[in-house]
A protein has these predicted regions:
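A hydrophobic, helix-centered structural microdomain
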Residues: 1-46, 82
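A short, structured surface patch at a secondary-structure boundary
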Residues: 55-118
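C-terminal terminal-structure detector
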Residues: 85, 99, 106-148
Length: 148
């Protein structure tokens, strides 16, 4: 059912800029175990050559097709493979990178409890809050997950 959309998105990524179609990144999952998350690449290659940086609506690292994909969440579709691999579920807290988890825990130590469940493609926090562009917004989104 999703095959035509996946093929269309992959073709548009390939035509929009140089680089791989899929983007993979280490995230922290269930019980603090690292795993590779898959997404359609929405940014130009070497977007994080200066270190980890969260994206925002004004982010110039995003490709024109990447802007559209992120608005429609099409870039997240390859995460269904993460669900099939058992790394993620459909619904659960969004998985983050260790770099950001370390910062979040300094302000919100209870964040470690998020790793007691499998991370998800979507969550109540994503529905209510959307993407986070800084650590403070990540903490606010987490509060929607934990109902704090």
């Amino acid at each position: 059912l999703l095959t035509p959309l996946l093929l269309y998105a992959a073709l548009k990524v390939r035509l929009s800029s140089n680089g791989p179609i899929l983007y993979k990144q280490e995230r922290i999952g269930l019980n603090g175990k690292p795993f590779l998350i898959y997404k359609f690449r929405s940014m130009y290659i070497d977007a994080e050559k200066n270190g980890p940086t969260l994206s925002s609506d004004e982010d110039e690292r995003r490709t024109p097709w990447g802007i559209i994909m992120r608005k429609m969440r099409i870039d997240e579709l390859p995460q269904f493979f993460n669900v099939l691999f058992g790394d993620m579920s459909l619904v659960g807290p969004r998985p983050e990178r260790k770099f950001y988890i370390d910062q979040i825990v300094m302000s919100a130590p209870h964040y470690v409890h998020v790793h007691r469940v499998r991370p998800g493609i979507t969550s109540w926090g994503m529905v209510q809050f959307g993407y986070a562009s800084n650590v403070e917004e990540m903490i606010k989104r987490m509060k929607w997950i934990c109902f704090m």
